[in-house]
Every structure is written in C-alpha cells, then in structure tokens.
Amino acid sequence: MARRAFLLGGTGQTGRALIPRLRGRGWEVVVGSRGEHELPPGVDHVQVDRADTAALEQALGNGTDVLVDFVAFEPEHAEQLLELKELIGSLVVISTASVYTDRDGRTFEEAKTPEQFPRFPVPINERGQPTVEPGDANYSTKKAAIEQVLLGQDALPATLIRAGAIYGPGGSVREWYFVKRILDERPYVILGDRGRSRFHPVSTENLAELIWLSAEHPGKRVLNAGDPGPPTLLDISRAIAAALGHDWTEVLLSTPGEPCETPWSCPRPVVLDMTEAAFEVGYRPVTTYERAVRATCEWLVEATKARPWEELMPRMAEYLQDAFDYETEDEFLRALITAD
C-alpha cells in the first residue's frame, strides 16, 4: 500500500519541487492549502485553512504517514499538530537558519549595524550553535518557539529543517535583485566588500531532496539546509548573468554599504554545516547554485512579463523598495571615476 504524504501549504515553490520526488518514489500526495491551485495529475488537493483545526482534522481523513508543514509560523501551529498526533505518522516542519545566534547573543533580526551582526563559526552546526530565545517578538523567535514545542515532545517524530536563503521558480526570490538589473540592461553591477559576502542559499530542489529523505527516515532532530559550495555574492551575480547571457562590468568596492547592499549582503559569513543531514538521512545534494539558478531566472523573466513584479513578489517588493535607484548608482559611479 502506498504511503501517504500530506503537504500543508504545499502549493509554493518548495512544495512543487517536492511533489515529483514523492510521487516518483511511490508516495500518494495530498496538498492542503487555503486557495484553489492547479497541481500535477494524480495529486489530490484539499482546500483547508490551517487556523481551523477541525477542518484540518477532516482534511487528514484516515491519517497520513508524514505531514510536511510549510506554513508553521506560530507556536500554536506546532501545538495544533500535536493535537492531531493520532492521524500523523511523522512530521517535517520548515524552520529557518535565522534562529541561530552567536555566542554573544547577536541575532539576524536585531542586527542594525555591521558590528551587531552575528559572528558565526564557519560552518554553523546544528548541535553546537545556540538559538534565539523562543517567543513572539519576530519571525525567528516564533520559529524557535515552534522548534521548542516539537523537540520537547515524544508523541511524534519531528524533523525541523533550518533552511538558508530559499530560491526556485514560483517564489519571492532574492535573485530578482540581479535579474531586474539585467532586464533593464544595466551595463555594470556594484558589489561591496569585493563581492565576498556569503549568505548560504538553498535551491528548492536540494530542499525537496532533504524533505523526502526526512520523510523516508522519521526522527526527532534538527537539520540544516543549504546548497553545496555556498557561493559568494560575486559568484551569485556571475551565475545569474551567465544564466541570462548578460555581460556587465563588475565594480568591486573594498567596503560594504550603499549603494551596493543586496539581499545576500552581510558583514560576516553565514555558512551552514550539512554534515548532520548526510549522517541522519543520507542526504546528498542534487544540484548546485550555478545549475539550479537558471530555472529561477527563466521563471522570473517569463512571470514578470505577465504581472508587475511588485504584485508577483509583494514581500520582495517591500524589501527591495529602494534597490533599483539607478540614478543614485550612476551618480555614485561618476563620483568614483572623478575621484580616481
């Protein structure tokens, strides 16, 4: 009899990468989400609001071998899953690498200056690195609270996946920072700290691989999720330019800061240790950033032909609201040339 996977909030970019992996290995897949979505043939869809526990219980029917939760944002969501433990064989819940804090208590969310940014070891290991205090102060503390609930119980095997900067077709992705510049035919790109900044990305393909392996091998644990050979900011800009066949002049500044702040810019490296994932579930990456980013770039080009990018990616629009001030960039570059 086929095993059953219930993907809660599974219509997004990672869910869509996960579905063929599960289906190809004989899993029956059911996707639960609030809206109506077109899914691949053979995949059942249940319209359900995860805030309604009774409705979620009904959606689970006779139960599921694994529930993958893409939309756990509050500790109450973890408690809700435990309420339904009789219907769930195991859990895989998407968390975030932003729960990590350094030994001095510095966090991602609270860092307003370079000096306040966490000083992490390279790489960051799940077992030894402290995390933020669980609470409701922000996204990271809420994720930490979810982890606390699920790791503090023995009713259900629960894998918490601390993902890096997720990218893939169909999502609100950081790659738009460079893709838009290419579409606007910018002749140069300005990068601070000579493009050495490193903020670990993870493709939806690699993340989906880790999720299905965690479903295959249930357990109570935390696993990092990041691409192999985490690229620098310069590597990322070059990979995206290569994917879209664009040539530009790289202006590599020795210091970080405006006007060259990007979604990956950070004063100290954030690199995730993937040893635990390999040891616990036999994880091996299926792609690299250079290979995987091409599909993301192609999707961005096509998707933004039909809709304004601000509508397509509202969260990224808020984050990048001042990122495409080309007039300021041009003035900065002219001043730089004059100074030389």
Give the residues covered by each predicted segment.
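Conserved Rossmann-fold NAD(P)-dependent oxidoreductase catalytic core, especially the SDR/UDP-sugar
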Residues: 80-144, 151-152
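Conserved beta-loop-beta element that borders a ligand/cofactor-binding pocket
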Residues: 144-169
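Mid/C-terminal beta-alpha module of Rossmann-like enzyme folds, strongest
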Residues: 210-269, 274, 294-295, 307-340
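N-terminal Rossmann NAD(P)H-binding glycine-rich loop of SDR-like oxidoreductase domains
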Residues: 5-25
